[in-house]
Amino acid sequence: MARNKPLARKLRLAAAYKENRPVPIWVSVKTRLKVRRGFRLRHWRRTKLKV
């Protein structure tokens, strides 16, 4: 990817970076481990962003 990115692309990449994190611990505790894993987790090599 280019070093100099347009601002819109940079903002979209930043948003995708922020939302790609696991479920908080308190959610697992509150739901008694019914929610263990975020279904929207994305691996950088398996699934590419449409940016």
UniProtKB/Swiss-Prot annotation:
Disulfide bonds: none annotated. SUPFAM superfamilies: Ribosomal protein L39e. Pfam families: Ribosomal_L39 (PF00832). Keywords: Ribonucleoprotein, Ribosomal protein. It comes from the Archaea. GO terms for biological process: translation. One of its GO terms (cellular component) is ribonucleoprotein complex. InterPro entries: Ribosomal_eL39, Ribosomal_eL39_dom_sf. GO terms for molecular function: structural constituent of ribosome. Belongs to the eukaryotic ribosomal protein eL39 family. NCBIfam families: PRK01242.1 (NF002316). This is Large ribosomal subunit protein eL39. It comes from Staphylothermus marinus (strain ATCC 43588 / DSM 3639 / JCM 9404 / F1). The gene is rpl39e.
